[in-house]
Swiss-Prot record:
GO terms for molecular function: tryptophan synthase activity. Keywords: Amino-acid biosynthesis, Aromatic amino acid biosynthesis, Lyase, Tryptophan biosynthesis. This is Tryptophan synthase alpha chain. Belongs to the TrpA family. The lineage of its organism: Bacteria, Pseudomonadati, Bacteroidota, Bacteroidia, Bacteroidales. Tetramer of two alpha and two beta chains.
Amino acid sequence: MNRINQLFSTKQKDILSIYFCAGFPTLEGTASTIKVLEKKGINMIEIGIPFSDPMADGPVIQHAATRALKNGMTLKLLFDQLKDIRKEVQIPLVLMGYLNPIMQYGFKDFCRTCRETGIDGVIIPDLPFKDYMEEYRSIAEEQDVRIIMLITPETSEERIRLIDEHTDGFIYMVSSAAITGAQKDFNAQKQAYFQRIADMNLRNPRMIGFGISNKQTFETASAHAAGAIIGSKFVTLLDEEDGDTEKAADKLLEALKN
């Protein structure tokens, strides 16, 4: 069974997924960051593939991507860094990146290397659902790689039902149609959106991302979905701690408790 499906079959609530950008703040820290996060009890990890034009990302993750590219991070190097990761790490690993670098690598080769490396899923924010259905789905399924689709408050019920029917793993609920970044709490409008999706009784579990940074936002996300994805907050802490994942993770976990 794919590790993503395994996770959601054994844990239905309070799942914590952490995002970081490969190659930030240092080029060589990718594997060690993953190992530390697993040790700290994180349930799933999203590894960002840096790209020069990350349209869905806020200033924090844009800055991380720019620095990672300057450091020399590439998709090929990322796969090289992860080639032995499954000797030590058991939790699901998901790559998050834009279509451009993935297509330069070659989508078939990309999915095959994901399987060989032990990557369980891929989030591609700028992959149109129609293209996924017509071209990419069968290639990914052949390699047992889950393609995770995003929905926003503006996504129609019809589209959400289609995504739920034709994907497997989890649905990434973007808390707002804006770019990523921390929020102190979720307003009534956002909570109504979370509840509306929960009431649809979808087949796939849902994870809420964009704006999770403290106990309040994490608990709200967990009340309406299987858990939360935290990116900008952790990337900021990694930067502040000069790449010390141990300290950054401790500070994040502390923020989620108080």
